[in-house]
Amino acid sequence: MSDNDVAAKRLTKPKLERPKLYKVLLVNDDFTPREFVVMVLKAVFRMSEEAGYRVMMTAHKMGISVVVVCAKDVAETKAKEATDLGKEAGFPLLFTAEPEE
């Protein structure tokens, strides 16, 4: 093995794959008050009042709405935190995390 072969091997960088992204979804229900949903979106996802209202209304009209797209661990943590806030308040509020396509 020549010195050139060794140098070439040292300069080769491993290919790093980007982590797969996940989307957090807000699932509409007929019981959780709109104001509470917006409050959760503001608290957990740091949304403005206007952005939270838009996401909530999209879920209300379409049945589901994408809240945010982020890394898997962050998406799962945020979805659980937001769902837990609903449960603590006695509402069936549901957020899920699933792979972004």
From Swiss-Prot:
Involved in the modulation of the specificity of the ClpAP-mediated ATP-dependent protein degradation. Belongs to the ClpS family. It comes from Rhizobium meliloti (strain 1021) (Ensifer meliloti). It comes from the Bacteria. Transmembrane segments: none annotated. HAMAP family: ClpS (MF_00302). PANTHER family: ATP-DEPENDENT CLP PROTEASE ADAPTER PROTEIN CLPS, ATP-DEPENDENT CLP PROTEASE ADAPTER PROTEIN CLPS1, CHLOROPLASTIC. This is ATP-dependent Clp protease adapter protein ClpS 2. Binds to the N-terminal domain of the chaperone ClpA. One of its GO terms (biological process) is proteolysis. It holds the Pfam family ClpS.
